[in-house]
Amino acid sequence: MPKMKTKSSAKKRLKVLGGGGFKRAHAFKRHILTKKTTKNKRQLRGTSMVDATNVASVRAMMPYA
């Protein structure tokens, strides 16, 4: 059976953590930032975890992670 391919978009956007979870960046932080409040932009900093309901989909996109 041939090797499964990893989705390039997923490997660029997600990092695998030791416990089996995935780390992701926040959306809505690239452009059109003038109309967003300082509080909103501050809360979009950093990273968060992929939700448990989506972990199975992410694992299918990254079979060797």
Curated annotation (Swiss-Prot):
GO cellular component entries: cytosolic large ribosomal subunit
A single GO molecular function term of this UniProt record: structural constituent of ribosome
InterPro entries, per database record: Ribosomal_bL35 (IPR001706), Ribosomal_bL35-like (IPR021137), Ribosomal_bL35_sf (IPR037229)
Single GO biological process annotation from the record: translation
Gene3D superfamilies the UniProt entry points to: 4.10.410.60
Key word Transmembrane helix present: no
Keyword Ribonucleoprotein: yes
Keywords linked to the UniProt accession: Ribonucleoprotein, Ribosomal protein
Family to which the UniProt record says this protein belongs: Belongs to the bacterial ribosomal protein bL35 family.
Protein name per its UniProtKB record: Large ribosomal subunit protein bL35
